[in-house]
Design a protein with these regions (language model features):
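Positively charged, polar, low-complexity stretches
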Residues: 1-96
Length: 96
C-alpha cells in the first residue's frame, strides 16, 4: 500500500466510529472471528482499545491484521483502522 493510498483511507476512516472494543481480556478468538466476519460487510473498520486493556494497541493492531488477513492503516492512541478489500466487488477505490 502506498502512502497516497494510506492517506486516502485515513481520510475515509476519520468519520468512522469504532465498531469493536478490545477490553481487559484483550484479543479473544471470538473477537478476532467477529472482526473477520465484519469484513464481509465493511472494507474499512475502526477498533478501539479500552483503558482497562493492558496490552499495547500497536501490538494488538498488528495481531488482528495478521489473523484477519487485513492491512493496518493507522494506529492513533488507543484506536486503530484496518482495511481489507472485498474480493468480488471492492467498494473503496484506492488512488494509484
Amino acid at each position: 500500500m502506498t502512502s497516497k493510498q494510506r492517506a486516502y483511507l485515513k481520510s475515509l476512516a476519520s468519520n468512522l466510529d469504532p465498531i469493536f472494543q478490545v477490553g481487559k481480556f484483550s484479543l479473544t478468538p471470538e473477537l478476532t472471528d467477529a472482526i473477520g466476519e465484519a469484513f464481509n460487510n465493511n472494507e474499512l473498520i475502526k477498533i478501539a482499545v479500552l483503558k482497562n486493556c493492558l496490552d499495547d494497541p500497536k501490538e494488538i493492531a498488528q495481531t488482528v491484521a495478521e489473523r484477519t488477513h487485513s492491512q493496518l492503516v493507522q494506529v492513533i492512541g488507543k484506536k486503530f483502522v484496518l482495511y481489507k478489500p472485498d474480493k468480488d466487488k471492492p467498494k473503496i477505490e484506492l488512488p494509484k
